[in-house]
Amino acid sequence: MTRRLKSGADLDAIGSRIRELRGSVHQQELAAELGISQGQLSKIERGKLGPTADLLIKLVERFGGSSDWILTGRR
C-alpha cells in the first residue's frame, strides 16, 4: 500500500526525491543542517514519514529547486 499525505502526495516518491537531492551528503550531516535527527531524515527518505512545510523550505534553500518538485515530481 502506498503511503500518502493528506494532499495525496506519495511519501515513497517524496522520500526518493529528497534522497536524490541529498546526493553524496551524509544523512547525519544534512539532518544536522536541517535541525532534525538522522533517524527522522531516514524515515522521510524511506517514505515512512512526510516532510513538514518547514523542512521543505529548508531543503529548497539548501539545494535549490522547488517544493513542488519534491512533493509532486513536476518541475
List where the protein language model places each region:
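A short, Lys/Arg-rich alpha-helix, primarily the initiator
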Residues: 1-25
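Short amphipathic recognition helices of helix-turn-helix/homeodomain-type DNA-binding modules
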Residues: 2, 69-75
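Residues within the helices of the helix-turn-helix
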Residues: 19, 28, 57
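Short alpha-helical DNA-recognition segment
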Residues: 23-46
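Residue-level detection of the helix-turn-helix DNA-binding "recognition helix"
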Residues: 46-48, 57, 61, 75
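Amphipathic, hydrophobic secondary-structure cores in small proteins
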Residues: 47, 51-52, 70
